[in-house]
Amino acid sequence: MNKAIKTVGFMFIMILLSKVLGQVREMFIASTFGAGGIADAYYAASSLPLNLFDIVFASAISSAFIPVYNTYIEKEGIEEGDRFASGFINTIFLGSVIISAILMIFSDLFIYIMAPGLHGDVHNLAVKLTIIMTPIIVFASLTFCFSGLLQSKGEFNVPAVISIISNSAVIIYIIFFNKYFGIYGLAFALLIGWGLQFLVQIPSAHKNGFRYKRVFYHKGLKDVVKLALPVLVGTWIQPISNMINNAYASSLDKGISSLNYASKLYLIVSAVFTVSVTNYVFPLLSKQSALEDKDGYKKTLCASFKIIVAVLVPICALMLALHTPIIEIVYKRGEFGDEAVRLTAGAFYWYSFGIIFYGVLDLLNKAFYAQKNSIIPAITAVCAIALNFVLSYFLKSLMGIYGLALSAALVYAFMAITLFIALNKKVRFFSLKDGVFFIKAIIYGIVSLIVTKGVFTLLSPIDTSVLLKIVRTGISCVAGVGVYGIFIILFERKLIKELKKN
């Protein structure tokens, strides 16, 4: 238990630092380029290779590779495991090069399809930036391969640190070199950052015993394909939803950039408090499933579920209560003015309703993948994509950019609830008694929201500068989280003891 706490604690700190730097990066971009045409072109271009990577490779690597690799390590030894890993890495590398070449050749067509609202110079700029950033697909694929390999070997520290390097590269560029190279240099800086993420993991992989083999085919690749195809479909919801929202938002003034600023902050907040848990738990669930340790699997899953819910409920309350001051503090400077704040804060507010569902969705997906069951997540994702398309169309007509954010939140809720029901029906990891905690956590969260909003309103006379706004917002956050924490300590002692055991 102590080792687990230390590992997850270190991962949390590193992920927190990484996400903070990621948000600092977004703050610099917002301040330098605002929420206009240049920013729209950059986000349309940068999202293309990243979304294609997510659609084709990301979850196949992180969710299909780890269970199969662990199976070979446990049953056939390290040598055979490394042969499988080498064959997998080589296959992924070749596939990512082919996808990158296709995107570079047809970049104009891709931008036209994915961001039809961009015209003239903005469209042309997006095409040029896409060509520059397309090799990110190759570096991201290799980065994910080595991160999965290291996590399977029990090395969580290096994968948790690598994003710090790439975010730092972009920040350094904006501070020191942006005045010379502008938006094109920013695209190259992002590309270099992804390359560094891959390179820094190679020494750690060697240190942890991985030995690369010149293997271009391994029988285990068939197992990966069987698991990966439905996994890919199951994880299409995030990138395809991004593409749908960008396509709709491109017809709105400052739509793409405002939606991106809001969604990235929302995803950063969620990831900080969930990724450290799910990244640690997934290899553990995979091993428990491979060893047919059903009781251990259920206990690990239930404890992880409760931790994520307990942490995200007060975060959701803070985001709902303080969405506008949060956006003002994070983004409002330079080219990012009042109108951009209004649009981004509104989108951030509606995104916030989905943060709890988004957090548990990641855990539930990985719980299915640990059992080598990817059919149910795949079917759910297909339904969710269709739902998102319909909801985005109608809600955009009613609410503009805010409707796109609400659509995303509702889709996450649909997926999380569907997967929860399906998984609990199969393994019975969550009882009615456990469900009482969820209801109580929501009640505590509502009280926290009221307290946070009340304190923020009471402190309005001191809000006369940026520094005092930060102080006002900080005090309100502490008050809201403090009340929630008191409820947990006073009324959930049994839960705290249970989590310590697991």
Predicted regions and their residues:
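Membrane-embedded alpha-helical bundles of multi-pass transporters/translocases
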Residues: 1-502
